[in-house]
Amino acid sequence: MHINQKIRFAVIDRQADSLHSLIADGQYRNTSLGRDAWKALIGSQGSLQRYCNKEGFNALSLLSSVVKIRIGIVGHDYGGCSYCDSRIGFGAGGYPDDSNVCGNVADGRYDPDNGGKNIKGIGYILVQ
Protein backbone atom coordinates (compact mmCIF):
# COMPACT_ATOMS: atom_id res chain seq x y z
CA MET A 1 0.00 0.00 0.00
CA HIS A 2 1.35 3.42 -0.97
CA ILE A 3 0.61 6.15 1.57
CA ASN A 4 2.48 9.43 2.12
CA GLN A 5 5.43 8.54 -0.14
CA LYS A 6 5.93 5.16 1.59
CA ILE A 7 5.16 1.73 0.18
CA ARG A 8 4.44 -1.05 2.66
CA PHE A 9 3.63 -4.69 1.96
CA ALA A 10 2.02 -7.60 3.77
CA VAL A 11 2.17 -11.21 2.61
CA ILE A 12 -0.99 -13.32 2.60
CA ASP A 13 -0.04 -16.95 2.02
CA ARG A 14 -3.10 -18.46 0.36
CA GLN A 15 -3.48 -21.21 -2.25
CA ALA A 16 -6.02 -20.50 -5.01
CA ASP A 17 -6.41 -20.77 -8.76
CA SER A 18 -6.41 -16.96 -8.99
CA LEU A 19 -7.11 -13.83 -6.98
CA HIS A 20 -10.40 -13.61 -8.88
CA SER A 21 -11.43 -17.02 -7.54
CA LEU A 22 -10.93 -15.74 -3.97
CA ILE A 23 -13.10 -12.64 -4.27
CA ALA A 24 -15.51 -12.90 -7.21
CA ASP A 25 -18.19 -14.98 -5.47
CA GLY A 26 -18.40 -12.57 -2.54
CA GLN A 27 -17.88 -15.32 0.04
CA TYR A 28 -15.87 -14.43 3.15
CA ARG A 29 -12.50 -16.19 3.40
CA ASN A 30 -10.51 -15.44 6.52
CA THR A 31 -6.83 -14.61 6.80
CA SER A 32 -4.65 -14.54 9.90
CA LEU A 33 -2.35 -11.54 9.55
CA GLY A 34 -3.70 -9.88 12.69
CA ARG A 35 -4.75 -6.29 13.29
CA ASP A 36 -1.18 -5.05 13.90
CA ALA A 37 -0.03 -6.26 10.47
CA TRP A 38 -2.97 -4.54 8.77
CA LYS A 39 -2.29 -1.32 10.72
CA ALA A 40 1.38 -1.52 9.72
CA LEU A 41 0.32 -1.09 6.06
CA ILE A 42 -0.79 2.42 7.02
CA GLY A 43 2.15 3.23 9.30
CA SER A 44 2.01 4.99 12.65
CA GLN A 45 -1.29 6.68 11.75
CA GLY A 46 -3.19 3.38 11.33
CA SER A 47 -6.36 3.17 13.42
CA LEU A 48 -9.00 0.50 14.03
CA GLN A 49 -11.69 -0.08 16.56
CA ARG A 50 -10.71 -2.68 19.13
CA TYR A 51 -13.35 -5.35 18.50
CA CYS A 52 -14.66 -7.56 15.70
CA ASN A 53 -11.34 -7.59 13.77
CA LYS A 54 -12.80 -9.64 10.92
CA GLU A 55 -10.05 -9.96 8.33
CA GLY A 56 -9.67 -11.64 4.99
CA PHE A 57 -11.21 -11.68 1.53
CA ASN A 58 -14.71 -10.17 1.31
CA ALA A 59 -14.74 -9.12 4.96
CA LEU A 60 -17.85 -7.16 5.83
CA SER A 61 -20.00 -6.08 8.71
CA LEU A 62 -22.97 -8.34 9.42
CA LEU A 63 -25.13 -5.65 7.85
CA SER A 64 -23.31 -5.67 4.52
CA SER A 65 -24.62 -2.24 3.58
CA VAL A 66 -22.51 -0.67 6.36
CA VAL A 67 -18.90 -1.70 5.53
CA LYS A 68 -17.37 -4.13 3.06
CA ILE A 69 -13.84 -4.74 1.90
CA ARG A 70 -12.42 -7.08 -0.74
CA ILE A 71 -9.09 -7.65 1.01
CA GLY A 72 -8.58 -6.29 4.50
CA ILE A 73 -9.90 -5.97 8.04
CA VAL A 74 -12.98 -4.36 9.59
CA GLY A 75 -13.38 -3.26 13.20
CA HIS A 76 -16.16 -2.37 15.61
CA ASP A 77 -16.31 -0.52 18.94
CA TYR A 78 -17.78 -3.45 20.87
CA GLY A 79 -18.26 -7.21 20.46
CA GLY A 80 -19.86 -8.44 17.26
CA CYS A 81 -19.49 -7.14 13.73
CA SER A 82 -22.93 -5.72 13.01
CA TYR A 83 -22.09 -2.02 12.46
CA CYS A 84 -18.37 -1.81 11.75
CA ASP A 85 -17.07 1.77 11.72
CA SER A 86 -13.43 1.18 10.77
CA ARG A 87 -11.49 -0.64 8.07
CA ILE A 88 -8.08 -1.05 6.48
CA GLY A 89 -7.52 -2.63 3.11
CA PHE A 90 -8.19 -2.80 -0.61
CA GLY A 91 -11.47 -2.57 -2.53
CA ALA A 92 -13.43 -1.04 0.32
CA GLY A 93 -16.72 0.78 0.56
CA GLY A 94 -19.35 1.93 2.97
CA TYR A 95 -19.67 4.01 6.09
CA PRO A 96 -18.34 6.56 6.98
CA ASP A 97 -16.64 7.34 3.61
CA ASP A 98 -17.70 5.30 0.61
CA SER A 99 -15.15 7.09 -1.60
CA ASN A 100 -12.15 5.69 0.31
CA VAL A 101 -11.60 2.42 -1.54
CA CYS A 102 -8.00 1.77 -0.45
CA GLY A 103 -6.51 2.79 2.86
CA ASN A 104 -7.83 3.37 6.38
CA VAL A 105 -11.16 4.74 7.57
CA ALA A 106 -12.02 4.95 11.27
CA ASP A 107 -14.95 6.99 12.57
CA GLY A 108 -13.59 9.00 15.50
CA ARG A 109 -16.94 8.98 17.30
CA TYR A 110 -16.70 5.25 18.00
CA ASP A 111 -13.40 4.86 19.88
CA PRO A 112 -10.82 3.75 17.31
CA ASP A 113 -7.47 2.96 18.94
CA ASN A 114 -5.54 5.80 17.22
CA GLY A 115 -8.30 8.36 16.67
CA GLY A 116 -10.51 9.06 13.70
CA LYS A 117 -8.83 8.58 10.31
CA ASN A 118 -9.59 8.91 6.63
CA ILE A 119 -6.34 7.98 4.91
CA LYS A 120 -6.50 7.21 1.21
CA GLY A 121 -3.81 5.08 -0.40
CA ILE A 122 -2.85 3.42 -3.64
CA GLY A 123 -3.07 -0.35 -3.56
CA TYR A 124 -0.62 -2.80 -5.09
CA ILE A 125 -1.67 -6.44 -5.15
CA LEU A 126 1.00 -8.83 -6.39
CA VAL A 127 0.03 -12.45 -7.04
CA GLN A 128 2.49 -15.30 -7.41
Descriptions of predicted regions:
Residues 1-128:
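Mature extracellular or lumenal effector domains of secreted proteins
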